[in-house]
Amino acid sequence: MYYTYIIYSESYDIYYVGQTNNLEDRVNRHNGNRNKYTKGKGPWILVFSQKLDSRSEAVKLERKLKSFKNQYTLKAWINKNRGLEHPV
């Protein structure tokens, strides 16, 4: 199983989109400052995740979410899809 996920930093008011096969470990890595982009910008809160059958499906959704022009579009998508897998 793979996951596409969105985490949020309240202190910086930013979202990060990613995909992984181990969701809990990946979020812990973001909060442990072991990721270049998210380092020092936490704490990070998981606001959305969706379980997918393959990595290619997870990457496809990740790319779609990263293609949104701004965080407001991403936030609207999260609100529309809330409850799909992981509630905000």
Residue ranges, per PLM feature:
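GIY-YIG nuclease catalytic motif and its immediate N-terminal context
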Residues: 1-36, 40-52, 56-66, 71-88
